[in-house]
């Protein structure tokens, strides 16, 4: 009994921490800024939201993303230009001033603060702002899920993490050298989280949720063989053989020949 109470207490504290997490829904202060990078760039403040298209500049969206993920506080104009636009290093200081001016005008629509400031060390995010990102929140939720004492709480935490992921980090810059490693890290983490969630939902016989999350994840990562495995398994358990057959066809389109054969074998089908 004491152990059960301890588990319940730990899970309650975990959920309390989750509910207090900084997100677009609970921004209150004018100093709070939430930046979403999964899929497209979005910036939230207490006064509204800026979408990537509102910035009207691929360079500005790349600048903001680079400053967020670089792990360094401030960067010189030349350093930024060399990282993002190595083929265009003509007058980087002037070009950066122009970008910052345009950003200031646009960000001014949803905040009286400056988002990026110039310092003796270079350009950086305004230290007076409290900035949180979706990928940081994703990390926090995955860490909490790994420590959850109950399957139910683990499932809820994984669901919340997975719901944040709408595609690769700044998908409009997908494949650019400065972003590849960082984006791949979260793409792989997302696939791992999805596969764990589907496994847990199957154990709970929550087939409707399993179908929902598997289908959504396969729209984002159609090459995830485990996503097809759990979805087809769930459909077969529910007697939905025609839908399962349709998923087999989709799997055949997106998986390698070897992956498809392994999928069929693991599900006990010949797939001839």
Set out the residue ranges of the language-model regions.
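Short boundary/linker motifs that mark transitions into or out of structured domains
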Residues: 2-61, 114-122
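Intrinsically disordered, charged and Pro/Gly-enriched terminal/linker segments
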Residues: 69, 89-90, 124-272
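DNA-binding patch around the recognition helix
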Residues: 28-36, 98-129, 255-264
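DNA-recognition element of transcription regulators
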Residues: 37-40, 55-65, 89-110
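Cytosolic linker/terminal segments flanking nucleotidyl-cyclase catalytic modules
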Residues: 1-34, 240-243, 248-272
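Short amphipathic alpha-helical recognition elements used for nucleic-acid or partner binding
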Residues: 51-84, 103, 226
């Amino acid at each position: 009994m004491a152990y059960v109470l301890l588990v319940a207490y730990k899970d309650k504290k975990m959920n309390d921490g989750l509910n207090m997490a900084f997100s677009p829904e609970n921004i209150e202060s004018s100093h709070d800024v939430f930046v979403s990078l999964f899929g497209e760039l979005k910036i939230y403040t207490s006064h509204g939201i800026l979408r990537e298209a509102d910035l009207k500049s691929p360079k500005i969206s790349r600048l903001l993303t680079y400053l967020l993920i670089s792990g360094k506080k401030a960067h010189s104009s030349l350093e930024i230009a060399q990282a993002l636009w190595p083929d265009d290093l003509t007058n980087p200081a002037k070009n950066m001033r122009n970008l910052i001016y345009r950003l200031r005008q646009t960000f001014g629509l949803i905040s009286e603060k400056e988002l990026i400031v110039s310092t003796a060390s270079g350009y950086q995010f305004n230290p007076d702002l409290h900035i949180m990102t979706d990928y940081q929140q994703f990390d926090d939720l995955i860490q909490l899920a790994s420590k959850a004492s109950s399957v139910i709480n683990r499932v809820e935490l994984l669901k919340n993490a997975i719901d944040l992921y709408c595609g690769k980090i700044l998908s409009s810059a997908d494949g650019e050298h400065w972003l590849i490693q960082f984006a791949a890290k979260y793409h792989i983490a997302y696939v791992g989280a999805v596969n764990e969630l589907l496994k847990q939902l199957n154990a709970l016989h929550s087939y409707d949720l399993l179908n929902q999350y598997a289908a959504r994840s396969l729209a984002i990562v159609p090459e995830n063989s485990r996503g097809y495995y759990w979805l087809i398994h769930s459909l077969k358990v529910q007697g939905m053989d025609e839908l399962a057959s349709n998923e087999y066809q989709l799997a055949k389109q997106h998986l390698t020949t070897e992956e498809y054969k392994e999928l069929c074998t693991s599900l006990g089908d010949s797939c001839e």
